[in-house]
Every structure is written in C-alpha cells, then in structure tokens.
Amino acid sequence: MADKTLNQIRTTFLDYFEKNDHKIVESSNLVPNNDPTLMFANSGMVQFKNIFTGLEKRDYVRATTSQKCVRAGGKHNDLENVGYTPRHHTFFEMLGNFSFGDYFKEEAISYAWNLITKEFGIDKNRLYVTVYHNDEEAFNFWKKIAGFSDDRIIKIATSDNFWSMGDTGPCGPCSEIFYDHGDHLEGGLPGTKNEDGNRFIEIWNLVFMQYEQISKDKRINLPKPSVDTGMGLERIAALLQGTHDNYETDHFKKLILSASDTLNVKVTDDNQSSFRVIADHLRASSFLLAEGVLPSNEGRGYVLRRIMRRGMRHSHLLGSKKPVFYNIFKTLLEEMSNNYPELERAQSLIKETLKTEEEKFLVLLDRGIKILNEELEKVEKILPGEVAFKLYDTFGFPLDLTEDILKNKSMTVDGEKFDLLMKESKKLAKKNWKGSGDSSVDQIWFDIKDRLGATDFLGYSTDKAEGVVTLILKNNKEVQDLQENDEGIIITNQTPFYGESGGQVADTGIISKEAFEFEVSDVQKKLGDLFVHYGKVKRGSVKLKDNVELKIDTQRRNNIRAYHSATHLLHEALRRVLGEHVTQKGSLVQSDRLRFDFSHMKPISDEEIRKIEHYVNSIIEKKSEVKTRIMTPKEAVENGALALFGEKYGDEVRVLSMGDEEGKFFSTELCGGTHVVNTADIGKFKIISQSSIAAGVRRVEALRDAQLIDFLKEKENQSNLSDQKNEAVIKELETKIIKLGGKPNLQNKDQVTLIKDLNRQFDQLSVISILKDKDKNKINDQTINGFKVRFQNIIDLPFKDLRKLIDEGKKEIGEGLVVIYAINDNKVGLAVGVTKTLEKKFDAVKIVRAGSEVIGGKGGGGRADFAQAGGTLPDKIEESFENIKKLIN
C-alpha cells in the first residue's frame, strides 16, 4: 500500500466494508443537525447518535463512513498543537464502521484484523492492542483471531479504554490498535509513563457499546449491543506511506508545496511549522465556509475566524504582505473536490471570503504586533492579561494567536486576567457550548411521541379538517381538559395547521366543537412530525378524546404561501445574478413580508437589484404551475434540487419546482413548506431593503401585491412633506439655470458664483434625499453618561457630505454628540460632532481616533467640535461605536 494516495486509502477502506454488507453513508455536515449542543462533528458516530440511543431507525444495521471532523473550540480543541506535532489537526477525516445491534466484538475484531493485515498489508509483528482491564471477551478474541501472545494485549484500567456518551446513556469498553514505528523514535507502550511519544501510535479504536448507564451507580446491559469504530485517515495514510508524520503524506505535501510556490519561500526545518499550520488551517477554513459558516465574533463563526487568522498570521511570518490563502485553495480543490463536491459548489464564496478576511486581518496584524512588541519590552516572561485582551478586543487577536506568537519567545500570557476581562465584557456574548444532552422539556416530547406517534399533516391539500384530541397540556403538565380562558396546548391525531419550520411561520386559526372554541396562536413541530397547537380557550371547554374541527386562517395562509414561493424565486435569482456562492443563511416567511439572509461579501448594486426583481417578476408573469414531487434525497439532488446545509432530510423528501424557462424549471428546492399552485398567485414582487447583518452575510426584505401597494403609498406620503419643502428650492434652481442661457461664461464672476451656488444647493438636496431613505439611513439616539448621543449609519453617502449631516444632527439633538458612519464602496467614513456647549468636556478628535482604530483607520483629524476619519473595515462599525461609548463613559 506504500504507493497508495490518501484518496485511494479512503476508497480501499470504504470498499472493504461495502463488500462486507455495510452501507456507505456520506459524511454528515460539520455542523451537527442532530445535536445543537455540539459545536462541530468531532467523530464518526455523531451522525448516528440517535440510532445508538434508540431515538431513530434506519433501513440498515451496518454502515461505513469517512466523516469530516473539526476539533477546535469546546471540549475537543487541538488548535494550539497544530503545526508543532506530527499528528494534530483542526480538520481531519475519521474512517469508521458501525453495527447497530447486528454484529459485535468478535466480528468487529475480525473485520479490523483482516483489513489492516491483508488489505493494507501492515506487518502484524508491529501491532499491539489494548483492551479494558476486565473485558475478557475482547482479550480472548484478540488471542483467537490475531494469534497474539498475552504481552501484546495490554489491559488498561483507565477511562481511555472505556467510552461513554455522557453521564447517562450507551457506553462500553474500547479496544485500541497501536503500531510500532520503530525504536529510532522515542516513546513507550500504552499504559507506561512515556506512552505519549511518537513510537507507538494508535491507529484504530473499536468501541463496544454493551451497557446503558442509568445513574452514577447503576449500569445495565443493552438488549442489542452495538459497535462504533474510528480510524484517522491522515494517520493511517502516514503509516501506509512509510512515515510517522501525517504532514509527510502525499496530500499534505501537495498543499505545502502549493503554499511554498505561492509565497515563493522554500520549506526549511526552521519554517516548516508555519507551512503545516497553513495547510491544516486552509482545510478547516474551506470546509467550514463550504457549509455556510462565516467568520464572526461569536459561536462557530468565531472559531472559524480563530483558525483563519492563526493560519494567516503564519503566512505573514513567512513574509507575505498580501492575501495568499485563496490562491492555495485551488490545490485543495483539486485534491478533495471529487470526494467532497461542496468545495466546488462553494468555491467562489470560499475564495472571496478567504481573500477579504486576510485583507482585513493584515491591516490589523501589523498594528497589533507593533503594540505587542512594545509591551513585550516591558515584561520578562508573562504578558499581562490586559494587553492580550486589548489585542483581542481592538485588533481581533484571538487569545490562542497571541499565545502562538509568545510560544516562539518562550513566554506566556496571564490567562486568568484575560478570562476575567472577557467575562466582564458585554460586547461579545459567547454561547456556552456544553456537552451532549437533552433538557427535561425535550424529554417530555420524546415520551409523548413514543405514545402518540406522528401527527398526520393535511395542510398541503386542505385548510380545515376533523381530528381527535389525543393530548392536552397546561403549564407543561398533562391534564384531562381545558376550561374557558385557560392557556394550553392541544395535540390532535391530524391537523391542517402548518408548524413553524424552514423559515415559514406557523398557521393560526381555530380548533372548535359545539360550544367550544380554542384560538390557535402558534404551532410547533416537535421531533420533526409531532404538531403542537398553542393557544387559549375563548369559550367552553375541551377534554381528551373529543372530536374537534381544526380550521386555519385561510387568508393569512394564502399570503404566507405566496411569500414562501417568492422566497424560492428570489433565492434562485440571487444565485443567477450574484453567483453560485450565494447560499441561504436564514429566512423568515410571514403573512406580510419576506426576509432572506444569504452569503455575499458586498452590497448589491441598484442594477443587480433590478436584474433580480426582473427574474422573479418574469417567472410570476409567466403564470407557471408549481410542481411538487416526492423523491429520495439522492434523486432530488440529481434532478438539480437545491438542498440547504444544516437541514436534516429523511429517506423521502418533498421537491418543489416552479417557473418554466425553456423547458426547464427556474427553481427546484427541497422544501416542506406550503406554496402557491401557480406563480401568478404571488403577484408583483419588489425588494424594499438590503443590509449587512454580519461579515459576509446580506439581508434583503421584499413585499408583494397588496402589501407592496400599501408600502409604496406610505412611502409616498412620508416623502410628500419633504417634497413640498424642497419644491420651492427646485423651482428656484430651475430659474437660475435658465438664466445661465446655455454654456456659462467662466470669466463672468456672477455666473461662476451662481454655478457654485447651484452645486451647493444640489448637494443639499442630495443629503436631504438620503436622510429620507430609511433603508439607507439608520438613526439610533441614546443617552450615555447623561448626554445625548446620536449614532447614525448611512449607506452610499459620499464622504464629503459627512460634515453636512453632522451639522444637521447637531441642530436636531440640541445638545450632545453626533457620531456618523458612512459606508461607500466597501469603505467606511467616520465623523464626530460635538455641540458648542460641550466642547470643553469632549474632544471630537480624540473620539474619532477611538473609533477609527477599530475600523482600520489611521487616526483622524479636525477640531474639538468636528473630526473625521476613514477606514477599510465596515463590518467593524458596531465595535467601533462601542469603543467610542467607552471613551464617553
């Protein structure tokens, strides 16, 4: 196998188990869809968790996978070791085979032994295994199958050889297979003091789930024991290619060579750690971006940003002064897109995000390192936590990046002080990612679902139906009935009410019978298909097993379904106009509007908006029939259906297609929502606003038909007052232009003065027009430390007009401060104004400098009452304003 590539080794593993009646199951998403408490998939068993716990069943009992995994952040965090050891990665692939109540220890050991010694051809004399100290079954099976003597089967009594899902749930002993890389490397056998060396390396872990942990002191046998195994692809590839170092495999060599060529720097012993960091972090960053995770300051996005910035800092160490990551991506695409086509589908988004993020970070990096070096001259061994926090808070240096810089200087950081400052900071609200586990409330729904089964949803074909009350809840407790004015929950055996999901809001309506009426205010789908009606009894009473009529608000439903269909058309139009990198990041489909969030790095131009609207309206005007088909997920994707990352699909999916375009559908998506029968039912469509909600994420809002007419009338009424005020000015300008009588005489002082006056007045009208546009002009008046502060964020405003708006703002607030940010052409202008009465207390120059350093600016200038600066980081506006607020306080 020494001549096999990493890709070929992956194929050999999967093919071997497929020949042995295992179903090859595609890797699940890195962002788990069955465990919201887990940050990233970190092992092969994550996607099978609910099968092992009995909450889910599939049509196979044997499976094999190559699972994408990320270990960075949370409980499993390998980030700080990457680049400095032969085996640590942030992104890796976990090969595995699984038995769900089918075969057990003997077969699992036999499959493993045959694969590694026969298919892979590994010398059995270099192999050792461990078993849990009291697992005599596994001990004896290894002797029988492998012919091992007792000294090659090592009994381990620690938790390293006993696996559990949590404090309760499935658990069992492990058996690990180790390979001896030779006595030229340091390290001892597992269980010895020097077991952590590079000589004896674990290559495969076999987990035998045979118990269920009921409580701390109680454990019972599972009726159907299962098997979960994990083998790191990069680790086995290193072994089979004759090295103990994962970074010396064919795959990493290509990535490192690509980085070397791009940077025009040769790999040496002194700089190889940096090249390894770049190769590893490019993989993790690209796969996370492909799934729609974008760099941000919280949650998964923050972990991605940490990975990206650590890698980019190492390219900077190698002499790079411009973005390089996006250029190296092409090699990763060549290497992995055949097995992971999502890389190709998202390549535009990946490259653009890598480039933009590196451009931003390089600006911050130079300034941050300068400050860090100045502070390092003042200390000997430990960097104060306050400095590390400033680097994090102002320059976007994650703590582990600062630690990585200090590592080469044999220094550390005061982590305790840093953590304390993080807790005190109100800016970044980090989510507390705990271990796996379900809340007690969730457990209620599991129990109810077990008793009642799924609810039959009839809402695709009808807006009313009869049903039987199967369960009533009041204050989260089961009761026999509900009386007048009681608030509670009703579950029926079937329902036409749509439960909130997929961005579509729930139906509302009435559940009734003679002398009883329950007003439904919300409907939620629990565990996928248990429909739960929330509401209040308006009259009468209801009890278990009553026959009732369920009727939705039809007019509201019709509006919702029209907006949902419009959302599908909008999604496809965005992809066609802006590019296939556009992926849905969120949506809200209501009865009076739609909101759609998607990945895109810059504002949409007016021309692009016109094209998008034209696409949508042209399909609506064609009066195309909307077609619904039921398929397997694989068939749906083969038919061009657009599936959404993070969505969980069953064995059959609902495929919605609409819009006839030269014999093909304009839009095809997997969707469980309600939709129009014909696109004509949508009515006229228009985008009314766009905004940025996060770095790389845009939001558009749109209206249709009656709501659009109402909106336009309201906007017209709002503008009439301003138009009346401006009308006199416009007429005066027209009169003055006529007086010029054609081409002006620039030698005539009166005409030159008139031209300047015209320009001034036109500029004034331009400013007034922007102020009227609520979509471009966001104003937030606050009181800080007893003073009025106006925070204003404006899109498309020429920076030269900032002074005018500051003056207008100061007039409006009377006494206080005005802080205005203007975004134009992906750059940001900042202006600060201080009213006359406060000039002795506040200095506009100091305030503008506090804000400009965060948005990538270089100081700023002006006077005590007005100062202005520019920057290159518009996504940092909120943080910049927070910095200003601190100074004011």
UniProtKB/Swiss-Prot annotation:
Localization (cell): Cytoplasm
Keyword list, A-Z: Aminoacyl-tRNA synthetase, ATP-binding, Cytoplasm, Ligase, Metal-binding, Nucleotide-binding, Protein biosynthesis, RNA-binding, tRNA-binding, Zinc
Amino-acid positions noted as binding Zn(2+) in the UniProt annotation, renumbered to this chain: H564, H568, C671, H675
SMART domains the record matches: tRNA_SAD
Coiled coil: none
Top-level taxon in the UniProt lineage: Bacteria
GO terms for MF: alanine-tRNA ligase activity; aminoacyl-tRNA deacylase activity; ATP binding; tRNA binding; zinc ion binding
Function: Catalyzes the attachment of alanine to tRNA(Ala) in a two-step reaction: alanine is first activated by ATP to form Ala-AMP and then transferred to the acceptor end of tRNA(Ala). Also edits incorrectly charged Ser-tRNA(Ala) and Gly-tRNA(Ala) via its editing domain.
Protein name stated in the entry: Alanine--tRNA ligase
Organism: Pelagibacter ubique (strain HTCC1062)
Source taxonomy: Bacteria, Pseudomonadati, Pseudomonadota, Alphaproteobacteria, Candidatus Pelagibacterales
Gene responsible for this protein: alaS
